[in-house]
Amino acid sequence: MICGLFREGKLKFLWPFNFLANSILKFDYILVQDEKSKKIIQNLGHNNTCLCGDTRFDRVYDTMSQDDSIEIIEGFKGNKLCMVAGSIWEEDERILVNYINTCEQDFKFILVPHEINKQKISKLRESISQTSILYSEFSEKNNKSDILIIDNVGILARLYKYADMVYIGGGMGPSGLHNTLEPAIYGVPIIIGKNYSKFSEAKQMIELGGMFSIKNDQEFKDRVDYLSKNKLAANKIGLINSNFVLDNKGATNKIMNYL
């Protein structure tokens, strides 16, 4: 078994009679993502258990290492501060739009809805008091807006390299927090919503000080204003996140050594 991830509450009832628990013990080797999983499996009686880590750290590092520049985004950002809001839902949009509509700073915003839906994107644009532009419509002549809305799929992970700070969607509602490792490797501060308890990497980055959880509009404003006005502090905060990814990569090589 590769990259196993187990939780105590999920497996308490499995042993000794459950089919799944017995099946787990039939593996010659079980490679797990974290120390808690290793202890759980060892407590079931499996001795060939190894902590290999999470291959997602390797994937985001590999993505960062590729030269995937996006000319349109470079032209849009210019020399201004830029926030990328990735995989946002309606609950996230309300907080973002409220800030955008009252923002007095010289800021660029790249908004990436979780669901690329024409009607929902139109509704989002209507809620923003400033003029916005769609990625599909962007050109050298049509580039005067400070708000760019991404209306195609497949480029989100590549957008984070242009961010000075990032908001990750999904945490303000029940949808589930989106990938926070993708922006972390680029060394930027990350803001998320209030619901993140099921995401160990988010909890770790918050404990380290590289990520911030907000519950409402005011907390979001306070955090963004601080990061935008304190560039040196923002850079140090972002470095915490990139170091977190670098410190945890290497699972792929460990797994290959067992194959």
Q: Residue locations for each model-derived region?
A:
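Conserved active-site histidine-acidic residue motif and adjacent donor-binding/catalytic loop
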Residues: 137-157
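Short active-site oxyanion
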Residues: 25-29, 81-82, 108-109, 146-147, ...
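Catalytic binding pocket for nucleotide-activated donors in carbohydrate/polymer assembly enzymes
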Residues: 27, 43, 156, 161-238, ...
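Active-site and donor-binding regions of nucleotide-sugar-utilizing enzymes
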Residues: 1-66, 84, 88-90, 102-103, ...
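C-terminal alpha-helical cap of glycosyltransferases
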Residues: 248-259
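Conserved catalytic-core segment of nucleotide-activated headgroup transferases in glycan assembly
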Residues: 65-137
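Short hydrophobic/aromatic-enriched beta-strand-loop microsegments
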Residues: 1-2, 48-54, 106-112, 132, ...
